[in-house]
Every structure is written in C-alpha cells, then in structure tokens.
From Swiss-Prot:
This is Hirudin-3. GO terms for cellular component: extracellular region. Residues 39-65 are annotated as: Disordered. It is found in: Secreted. Residues 1-3 are annotated as: Interaction with thrombin active site. Keywords: Disulfide bond, Glycoprotein, Protease inhibitor, Secreted, Serine protease inhibitor, Sulfation. Residues 55-65 have a biased composition (Acidic residues). Gene3D superfamilies: Thrombin Inhibitor (Hirudin), subunit I (2.70.10.10). Disulfide bonds join C6-C14, C16-C28, C22-C39.
C-alpha cells in the first residue's frame, strides 16, 4: 500500500491523484489495476519510499477553507 504525500502540518489532509483531497482524519490509498484512489480512516502518511524534506506538498488553499 502506498500513500500520497500529505501536508506537513497536523491537518491530516492527503492529496490523492487527480487532486482528490481526503478530509481530516483520513488517508489516501492509491488504487491499483485501474481502481480509483480511496480515502480511508487513518492519519496521513508520507510515501514510504522517500524520506526527504521534500516529501510534503502544500494542499491548494481552496481546499482548506
């Protein structure tokens, strides 16, 4: 299971592919074999294959209002 990049703040917002934002308290699981990405309960987690300062991406402000 691979998660999308999440915000560095404690907001627990994860940005799925296609700009799908999982709400607070949820994380995104990338779909495989043509399945769509899913938001499931759980704190957001950065992609496990990279552990750099650049792991995090800002959530567009329109999603934070």
């Amino acid at each position: 299971v691979v998660y999308t990049d999440c915000t560095e703040s404690g907001q627990n917002l994860c940005l799925c592919e296609d700009s799908n934002v999982c709400g607070q308290g949820n994380k995104c699981i990338l779909g495989s074999n043509g399945e769509k990405n899913q938001c499931v309960t759980g704190e957001g987690t950065p992609k496990p294959q990279s552990h750099n300062d650049g792991d995090f991406e800002e959530i567009p402000e329109e999603y934070l209002q």
